[in-house]
Amino acid sequence: MSEITLGRYLFERLKQVEVQTIFGLPGDFNLSLLDKIYEVPGMRWAGNANELNAAYAADGYARLKGMACVITTFGVGELSALNGIAGSYAEHVGVLHVVGVPSISSQAKQLLLHHTLGNGDFTVFHRMSSNISETTAMITDINSAPSEIDRCIRTTYISQRPVYLGLPANLVDLKVPASLLETPIDLSLKPNDPEAENEVLETVLELIKDAKNPVILADACCSRHNVKAETKKLIDITQFPAFVTPMGKGSIDEQHPRFGGVYVGTLSSPEVKEAVESADLVLSVGALLSDFNTGSFSYSYKTKNIVEFHSDYIKVRNATFPGVQMKFVLQKLLTKVKDAAKGYKPVPVPHAPRDNKPVADSTPLKQEWVWTQVGKFLQEGDVVLTETGTSAFGINQTHFPNDTYGISQVLWGSIGFTGGATLGAAFAAEEIDPKKRVILFIGDGSLQLTVQEISTMIRWGLKPYLFVLNNDGYTIERLIHGETAQYNCIQSWKHLDLLPTFGAKDYEAVRVATTGEWNKLTTDKKFQENSKIRLIEVMLPVMDAPSNLVKQAQLTASINAKQE
């Protein structure tokens, strides 16, 4: 095999970086490209219900595998995916967006083709994507095409941001040297500037040496930029109390003896709030300081000794070191921190009270009770997706087993995201370990936006748990504004009929409305095995919500009403 098509080259390269499932929809400008997927052993085409869901699915897949690929067609297809791509950009998720575009000659002649705006401008959609992409490429020359593909894959992986790659329909069948595949794409980070890195290390070590009450706070980019292992070692060596943000949930093993809980500013438990805000040194790993991640910007550190570790810069107090990457800094810090922290005397960490109060089996389910019980159902290695709304807030009250991976979209907050993301996560989990469970918590309102992807799960024999929280509409919106407004209402669905409607043969669909029904179901040994796709309708009161969401809604309503 001395030569291969450019299309096959793309998929061979993706397989080399462990991307085995491709998401998207066929369209006439990408059909020849899609043919090449089936030429690569071990590669599969998911085939989504729509492009938005495909982008969501790619996001969910990438959070577990490091990167993903979604393929759409020019214009109508790519624009449908952009909300999902924007979410991946905001949340630091590496998704390669490949767009099949018209041939180079059609573009040069400015033909009035379908899927265009009718003005001869073939660059407009590419330009739209450039604002939500780390980099973009429009292939125009077969000779440079392989190196451009390699650059796009590397950038997607390293930056953990979306990258746009346009492939003209007339180029995908042209041949390139197969020998190019023998040189792997370099996915390593470039070394830090030694002088800047040493200055950071020396300053941080001095701060650690002087600290009497330090804490470690892990946020979203701790997971996204692959420093979970370094952060765990930092906790092990120093014994500093460790906390996570809502977006960082799952970044630290919550069974670790030095884990103290979830910090969300004023929405934190009193014990966690006091522990974090009274610290004399905060080591913040991968922070994304958005409103819902910080209790509407209510962080209130008493110290100015704050070290922020980011993927592409470090901030120590008021000094910023651009280009200094946290991966290398943390690795070198681990070799020296033991001596710097030797004077630290460990203090007790907060422990959330476990809700073990007996309740009658006939007690109707309520959010506060459910989220304290979810942790009892979870197992090590689970992937837990929580939808924007009550689920994303309620999960902060759940104690995770070790090695639990949490997926939510706290910053971008696109309603329905987890419907598609669950599909992607289920594909990824199957590739990593077929026994790994994927568990979704989604509201009845959010489900209506992306429900079609359940059919794709069934088609591929995937076996997620789909917990549908039925509170009869958009509770999070009602809490912010319009409690009785018609626009926060939805049509009630027969949720238990969804799986057979989409063609499922081996499935379980069940409704739980009381604590007794919940306990009986979640403790059942057969139910705990991911042997089939399951949909569980959880009946909840209309205005019932986790206490932290009620407080957040009040803060959000207040901010929305401000005049200046």
From Swiss-Prot:
Alphabetical list of Pfam families matching this protein: TPP_enzyme_C, TPP_enzyme_M, TPP_enzyme_N
Residues annotated to bind pyruvate: 28, 115, 477
Catalytic activity line of the entry: a 2-oxocarboxylate + H(+) = an aldehyde + CO2; pyruvate + H(+) = acetaldehyde + CO2
UniProt-listed SUPFAM superfamilies: DHS-like NAD/FAD-binding domain, Thiamin diphosphate-binding fold (THDP-binding)
Domain of life the protein comes from: Eukaryota
EC number: 4.1.1.1
Annotated binding of Mg(2+), by residue: 444, 471, 473
Presence of keyword Oxidoreductase: no
Binding site for thiamine diphosphate: 390, 413-415, 445-446, 471-476
Required cofactor(s): Mg(2+); thiamine diphosphate
UniProt cofactor note: Binds 1 Mg(2+) per subunit. Binds 1 thiamine pyrophosphate per subunit.
Cellular component GO terms held in the UniProt record: cytosol; nucleus
Key words, A-Z: Decarboxylase, Lyase, Magnesium, Metal-binding, Thiamine pyrophosphate
GO biological processes: aromatic amino acid family catabolic process to alcohol via Ehrlich pathway
Molecular function terms from GO: magnesium ion binding; pyruvate decarboxylase activity; thiamine pyrophosphate binding
Enzyme class: lyase
Presence of the UniProt keyword Lyase in the record: yes
Family: Belongs to the TPP enzyme family.
Subunit composition and interactions: Homotetramer.
PANTHER family according to UniProt: PYRUVATE DECARBOXYLASE, PYRUVATE DECARBOXYLASE ISOZYME 1-RELATED
Protein name: Pyruvate decarboxylase
Organism: Kluyveromyces marxianus
Gene that specifies this protein: PDC1
